[in-house]
Each structure stands twice: as structure tokens, then as C-alpha cells.
């Protein structure tokens, strides 16, 4: 489900970029070689060990629109943030800043706006104001990332607390299991979403269960 959501985010970004460029253009091919797009879209996701669904979605995006270097309609450039992103924030920032060194870069999409995203976006904005900046799921303070990004897609955590149980029931679920870990639940927004989920489950008649998983970043709270 999350990979489908991320694909939709990227499709929106591609559509927005095409609109900004004056609409979709037919590839120009004056010789026997394949045409190449005149813009790139940078995508940052978590590594496979943290969020394999993000990597799968990125590969699908590359399959749909072509990866940079493919030669034919290659416009997606995919990187991951560091495994130990909690202690390597500077590396996250540098990987995002590297996108702005590409003169063809037109938009940057970060699936999960971990710490360092807002800082990187502010630096990119100062260097390349023409690049559009998108975040799927913000992990920094919403007010902070909203000031630096053009669009933050999933910033209404309370609504998610309502929508997820209703969607689960519509799909036939009788139990909703909320899986998280202390680092995430230390954030007020995520605690609120969990509380709303539990209350909504009680209202609509499905069982709510809560489980704790190991922190993929190896952090112990």
C-alpha cells in the first residue's frame, strides 16, 4: 500500500514538472539514437534494510520513467539516505545537495523527510531556486519542513488516525495492528495518530492491537 502511495506522489511530481516545463513534449530524435529528457527528477528513499517498499517503489518509478543514464527517457535519479541516518545527518544533507549539482535537475522527492531534509532543502533553495522540492512523509517538525518544501504530502497525522481504520474495515479487516517503536512514538504527532486509531477502531467495531518492533535505525530510547 505504501509503495503505491509513493508512486502516486512521484506521478504528481512528474506531472507538476511537465506543467512547469510547458506541458509534455514529444521526444526530439533527429538521428538514429534515442532521445533523452531535458530534465531529471531526484528521488531519495530509505535503504532496503529500513524500508524495502520504498526501494521497490523507486525501482517502479525508474521503470515507468527511465533511470538517469538509461539513454531513453531517463529522468529518475534514485539515492538512499544512510543506514545510520540518526547519527549521519550531514551525509543525508550532502546526498540531497548533490542533486542540485546536476544542471538538469528539476525536482527532488524525499519519500521520508528524516532529520536533515529541511536543512538540505534550504541550502538547495539558496543555490537552485528553480528546483521543486517535495516530501512524502515528514519526520521533522511539520512547521519546519513546510517552510522549506514546496509540497508536503502526508502531514495530517490526525486524519491518518481516522482514515487508516476506516480503510482497513472497508477491506474486510477485523483487527488493526499498530506496529511502531519508541523513537517514533516519542513524536507527539505519531502518538496522537495512534490514540485516534484506537478510538476509531472502538467506534467502528474492529479490534485494535499495538506491537513494538525493533528500531530499524538501531536506536534505543
From Swiss-Prot:
InterPro entries: DUF3798. Pfam families: DUF3798 (PF12683). This is Uncharacterized protein TP_0013. It comes from Treponema pallidum (strain Nichols).
